[in-house]
From Swiss-Prot:
Residues reported to bind UDP-N-acetyl-alpha-D-glucosamine: 10-12, 124, 195, 250, 295
Molecular function per GO: undecaprenyldiphospho-muramoylpentapeptide beta-N-acetylglucosaminyltransferase activity
Protein name as catalogued: UDP-N-acetylglucosamine--N-acetylmuramyl-(pentapeptide) pyrophosphoryl-undecaprenol N-acetylglucosamine transferase
Catalytic activities: Mur2Ac(oyl-L-Ala-gamma-D-Glu-L-Lys-D-Ala-D-Ala)-di-trans,octa-cis-undecaprenyl diphosphate + UDP-N-acetyl-alpha-D-glucosamine = beta-D-GlcNAc-(1->4)-Mur2Ac(oyl-L-Ala-gamma-D-Glu-L-Lys-D-Ala-D-Ala)-di-trans,octa-cis-undecaprenyl diphosphate + UDP + H(+)
Gene: murG
Top-level taxonomic group: Bacteria
Keywords: Cell cycle, Cell division, Cell membrane, Cell shape, Cell wall biogenesis/degradation, Glycosyltransferase, Membrane, Peptidoglycan synthesis, Transferase
Coiled coil: none
Record family assignment: Belongs to the glycosyltransferase 28 family. MurG subfamily.
Amino acid sequence: MRLMISGGGTGGHIYPALALIDALKAHDPEAQVQFVGTHRGLESRIVPERGIDFKTIKIQGFKRSLSLQNVKTVYLFLKSVVTARKYIKAFKPDVVVGTGGYVSGAVVFAASQMHIPTVIHEQNSVVGVTNKFLSRFVDKIAISFESARSQFPAQKVVMTGNPRAQQVANIKKSGALAQFDLDPDIPTALIFGGSRGAARINAAAVAAIPELNKRDYQTLFVTGQVHYEKIRNGLSATALAPNVKIEPYIKNMPAILPEVAVILGRAGATSIAEITALGIPSILVPSPYVTNDHQTKNAQSLVNAGAAELIKEADLTGTSLVAALDGLLQSTTHRETMAANAKKLGMPDAADQLLHVLETVIK
């Protein structure tokens, strides 16, 4: 198979694409892949590091108000479609896949106009603007949440789950918590606001430290690089008991997930895919700063299934954080029930499912 894939801007668009590429290579080591992204997005660093053929397109998103910038955006979009057509003619893909982000709009649209099979993957429960636009042109639409189905043409939709789930589903316990001087036999809570950290989650966690120090469970608090120094400088040398550890960033987060009893964090699509694939109980604090409040919708899908609890960011304090963790970590039965419900929602073969969709559209 010759696969052209496009997505970018955030990890939520990039990691599903990389998971699909891994699955394709596992099935067909001779497969050829080209990734089209932007020169400024996260993909410009991550994708070439994997040894994947990488091309760039210059594009920007629409402003939500009337703006001269939107005139420039239309011009850049049309120009980027021309560039995408050149890449497509040179690479000759069997199928073109978009995983979200403005750049995928130009690439997938160009492919559809050239009568090349096209598929888009929507990671969230609320459909992104690019995928909404592309839905009328593509052959198939893969979704990760059932709640996204009604937002697309019904005959095109296939439920596959998020390919990222397959990458983490088979990870086993490896004693990874030992590197943080944590005991693998004691239940551990992970507090994590995403790769950049989340100020409100961090503030609540800092306020909770005096109580967390007293608990018989462990806490691993990951602040995000930009917040770490300020938080550490604000704590005295004796502020942390041995059962509470603070880290700026964890390079290989999937490796520690099987050893975590509870996660408190955001409700991004990648996080949801990981915690359901592994069946980890979670306390979700959706970001209120994302488009169409899609993280709340993502979280609600788990809450409705008894697989997670939800705390609005405005309601998150040190006290509410400790109460939520206590409720799960001091009740093995409650935790096991939630873990089982989370596991039921997981799709550990999501990348293979999406790969099958690609095979069906290739004429």
